[in-house]
Amino acid sequence: MNEFLIRKAKKGDKDAFCRLMDEQVQSMYKVASAYLKNDEDVADAIQDTILSCYENLKSLKQNRYFKTWMIRILINKCRDILQRKKQITYTDQLPEMPFYEEEYASKEWAPV
């Protein structure tokens, strides 16, 4: 781990942050791929992690734990994606039910 890049990135050096992330992309890809099956979801998790790391880098207390901190953020992002996907119900997976009009049309027009 390049502590020099971490220190520079914490001071606001965008190039140092980009180089730091370039060093970590392969590790992030491996971890995210273990959690997520879809490459688009993996890319989203990595992108969200990079953004979160950029926004919160100053909160990192010990530079030597940067990778652990970053991977924990990535895992949380992966879990968020999995949770969102779990809440989505696809219409092709719903049981077929009769349409309202078909079921009640004869009753509505029936003589009273």
Which ranges hold each PLM region?
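Sigma70-family region 2
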Residues: 10-11, 37, 50-65, 85-86
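Phosphate-coordinating loops and pocket residues in cytosolic domains that bind phosphorylated ligands
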Residues: 22, 47, 71, 83-84
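Internal acidic/polar
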Residues: 88-112
